[in-house]
Amino acid sequence: MMEQRRFGDTDLVSSALGFGTWEMSTTEYGHIDVDEASAAVGAAIDSGITLFDTAEAYGPYHSEEILGRALGTRRKEVVLVTKVGFKVDGTPARDSTREWVLARTEGCLQRLNTDWIDLLLIHWPDHDTPFAETMGALEDLKTAGKIRHYGVSNFTVEMMEECERHGHPAANQIGYHLFDRRMEAQVLPYCLEQGIGFMAYGTLGFGLLTGAFTPDTTFEEGDWRSEGDAFNLPLFEQEHFLKELRCTERLKTLAARAGRSVAQLAIAWVLGHPAVSVALVGIRNRSELEENVAAVDWKLTDEDRADIDRIFAEEGVPTYVDALQAV
């Protein structure tokens, strides 16, 4: 059985590895074989993955629809996570007003073909709506039985503190991986102290830590990585990209010493932080699934972590611990 982890001080428990479905959007990650990705959903459940993460903005709507169909009769076997808070077809881009959150949640339920959502997240902070209003809407959805838990995504410590005055988020979902360690400064310690689960997205560095890229890799039109920016970090700008690839090659050699892949090293590194409830990975097919699942039982030693940091230092690759969070 795969390792199970609790979300902070709540009763929400899931597999340590989660199935991320941004790639299922069919619009933001280049071509994807929808049938193969759908088949991977059932295979993931068989492999012990119990958490599936999506959002209405992925596509928009495609990811929720594909996941809902793929889960089928196995819905009760999983922890289903989705997100609202974007006006995907208009401006302003973010909307966490009470009216919007309630209405969009109904749409999520329909697309996912379910009567309840295990964890509903506010996708990005809405700087124009009081958090008290948003939290009130989430509390009402919970009371109505339409969601079991609620949380936030991409929120700072100050934002979480304000939310805590009006309820208790079960989780904060933010990017965290070897090339982006911004959350180590404040957010991860806060979540650990306050009993809030932490969901790490981008565990594989949006592909940088898979070993699949080369200096000649280009991203097709419509793939968000083609813009160079990754949540306010220049990870996919050519100069940085080439440095990161050199770093990944050395990490690959380090992982091979333990008979592992660089992707497994990346997953094990994220899961090694005590605040992390679940590490999300995008899974396109069953072969990727098998590789990722095999990483969960690997516990990195202090020596392993020191070797990783030494590689970053020698290659001159920043980890952005002190950089500002994207909000």
Residue ranges, per PLM feature:
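N-terminal binding-site loop/beta-alpha segment at the start of enzyme catalytic domains
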Residues: 1-78
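Terminal-tail/helix-coil boundary detector
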Residues: 2, 219-253, 257, 272-277, ...
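Conserved, mostly hydrophobic/aromatic
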Residues: 7, 19, 37, 52, ...
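Active-site beta-loop-alpha junctions enriched in small/polar residues
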Residues: 22-24, 55-57, 83-87, 122-125, ...
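Alpha-helix N-cap and loop-to-helix initiation/capping positions
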Residues: 29-36, 62, 66, 93-103, ...
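Glycine/proline-rich, positively charged
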Residues: 42, 46, 89-182, 186, ...
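Aromatic-lined glycan-binding groove of carbohydrate-active enzymes
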Residues: 183-226, 261
